[in-house]
């Protein structure tokens, strides 16, 4: 019989611990009531042309029974409940691989208890290969493989090529046993076995109901962690649940513990969360913005002199004038301007012209402090304090009271990160005020436009210059012989 197939099955201990077991038990109680001889769903044999369809009932019979026996008023709710039970394989349509319930005359059949999901089946791919191979041996229209099943069979045949002979022999043996059964019994068992695999190897696009929710599994494996309330309170209804053993009484939380919990939840509320779509958009925009600066994707301009024999890069470095790409990059963000030495210099010149350079000078001094040897740190901390933060400092900066008080305490024990809070506050001020003014300033715009014009003029004259340089490097110049023509002598002198 079909029940004799040795599909993979878990032990009883694992079955009892399955998080889906409560749902299975409730569904099976309803199925047992459906199969009751007196008050259950009437099961009948239907004649169809020259054949008979044994042990079936219609989808409308299920919906009506659920409304009547489970006190369900809405037919849509009854249809939804029936669809969930069908998706778990407790009953199935006899002519469709999609396990769903329709409120019409579609014929359904109950699954045998041997194939119920409460038995915690874990069939392997070899079992599925034997089943599909057996289907191909039986010359029946109702047993023909669907498209996705044929693709699965071909994939399994490639995967188990070495032991396919054994799989074929096992399928052949099962097919011989099936032929010895009664015709009606064989028809019922074939449909039940097909429904079993429709649950465990569903049609593409359908949900696999046998998958275990990782959250439920974690709660079942660690019941003590999940039963404990965040606020130290015990739920009476949950504590009397048959699936949760009573836990020992815990002491009520102290005031300090409650304060810690409140602080923790406040931090969680303040956390900045982004949707995956927003993160993807941000990553795409960042990639598009920095595309021209990635030499793996686009050739750099100017090119690498070690690869192209073009000395434009060295000439620009010697002139200490930033390129157009370099100036344009300062506008991406304040970090880009501060990372570039020329960008820092231009930013500082602009702030000095507005008599507000103390913030940037303080930020640069703190960055320099982090790189100093440890023996120079205390003296350098005092110098920064006297210049920017002490009362009557020549270049006083504007700090909020909280940052100033914390920095005052840190100065008593000087270290490389004494001014960390003050530096962060100044950075935010520059990012929101000084940096936008620098980008909008005429100094930056003139520098950017000047680089664009110089870049265009360089493009117009570099073609001949490169040609002349290449000719001068590649063609040897020999002294002109006294008998050479004037034209050749003039050309030689020109080179």
Curated annotation (Swiss-Prot):
Q: What are the UniProt keywords, alphabetically?
A: Cell membrane, Cytoplasm, GTPase activation, Lipoprotein, Membrane, Palmitate, Phosphoprotein, Signal transduction inhibitor, Ubl conjugation
Q: Per its UniProt record, what Pfam families does this chain match?
A: DEP, G-gamma, RGS, RGS_DHEX
What molecular functions are annotated in GO for this chain? G-protein alpha-subunit binding; G-protein beta-subunit binding; GTPase activator activity; GTPase activity
Q: Which residues carry this modification: Phosphoserine?
A: 229, 241, 434
Highest taxon of the source? Eukaryota
Q: How is it modified after translation?
A: Palmitoylated.
As for subcellular location, the record says: Cytoplasm, Cytosol; Cytoplasm; Cell membrane; Membrane
Q: Name one GO cellular component term.
A: cytosol
Has keyword Cell membrane?
yes
**Record-annotated G protein gamma domain positions:** 255-316
The RGS domain covers 333-448
Residues in DEP domain copies? 37-112
Query: Matching InterPro entries, A to Z?
Result: DEP_dom, G-protein_gamma-like_dom, GGL_sf, RGS, RGS6/7/9/11, RGS6/7/9/11_DHEX_sf, RGS_DHEX, RGS_sf
Tell me, in one coarse class, where this protein mainly resides: cytoplasm
For the region Disordered, what residue ranges are annotated? 235-256
Q: How does it sit in the membrane?
A: Peripheral membrane protein
What is the role of this chain? Answer: GTPase activator component of the RGS7-GNB5 complex that regulates G protein-coupled receptor signaling cascades. The RGS7-GNB5 complex acts as an inhibitor signal transduction by promoting the GTPase activity of G protein alpha subunits, such as GNAO1, thereby driving them into their inactive GDP-bound form. May play a role in synaptic vesicle exocytosis. Glycine-dependent regulation of the RGS7-GNB5 complex by GPR158 affects mood and cognition via its ability to regulate neuronal excitability in L2/L3 pyramidal neurons of the prefrontal cortex.
Q: What is this protein called?
A: Regulator of G-protein signaling 7
Biological source species: Homo sapiens
